[in-house]
């Protein structure tokens, strides 16, 4: 089993280090990750400059680009053999509901999927307890299951794991994405030099968080696994828009 491992927190992040360590016990693992934190980079590709690839002292490769760049570069230009699977994470923080649109973690897995590879994004719904071994163990379980019973269709999974010890988990649930309220307003302040600057506001609170959603699973200390797709079409609105255009 050959695994390409990436993330959006950077090659130095504890999540990817924890995951690489346990995956190396069951697979050949190549780590290609951003040289710095690229959280929120979504599916962006770097097109305005060339990318460079370097190898760290710990054997991880890092790229001066986005999570999507990392996977694209590795699969299409770096690796001599294609990986059997792409895994992105472990992200330090949730990627539930609307988060998936912005997430570099999900984006790295999405790029693997677009390149024809089974892909998994995994996030620790962090409360600063640092239970990365819990999330890593969940990923190992999924990889072993994949090895024993490979998917017969292309698959892209978004996994969120409660920030608790493994023995406190209340199970695993296949879920749909919930929704958040709109994001908080930007935070505006002045620097000591009088310049007005802004920080992006916090994500909105959970809105659609009922039973069956990723939010609900995490609230009940269950691992959430959500199958994702690329097609963003609102099929139920095609007829409505056609009628609107003919008015």
Swiss-Prot record:
Keyword Hydrolase: yes
Binding residues for a divalent metal cation: 8-9, 39, 91
Entries under InterPro entries matching the protein: SurE (IPR030048), SurE-like_Pase/nucleotidase (IPR002828), SurE-like_sf (IPR036523)
Subcellular localization, as worded in the UniProt entry: Cytoplasm
Cofactor note text: Binds 1 divalent metal cation per subunit.
Molecular function GO terms recorded: 3'-nucleotidase activity; 5'-nucleotidase activity; exopolyphosphatase activity; metal ion binding; nucleotide binding
Required cofactor names: a divalent metal cation
Enzyme class: hydrolase
Catalytic activity field: a ribonucleoside 5'-phosphate + H2O = a ribonucleoside + phosphate
Entry EC number(s): 3.1.3.5
Keywords: Cytoplasm, Hydrolase, Metal-binding, Nucleotide-binding
Keyword Metal-binding: yes
GO cellular component: cytoplasm
Main location: cytoplasm
Family membership noted in the UniProt record: Belongs to the SurE nucleotidase family.
Entry function: Nucleotidase that shows phosphatase activity on nucleoside 5'-monophosphates.
Name recorded for this polypeptide: 5'-nucleotidase SurE
Lineage start: Bacteria, Pseudomonadati, Pseudomonadota, Betaproteobacteria, Nitrosomonadales
Gene this chain is encoded by: surE
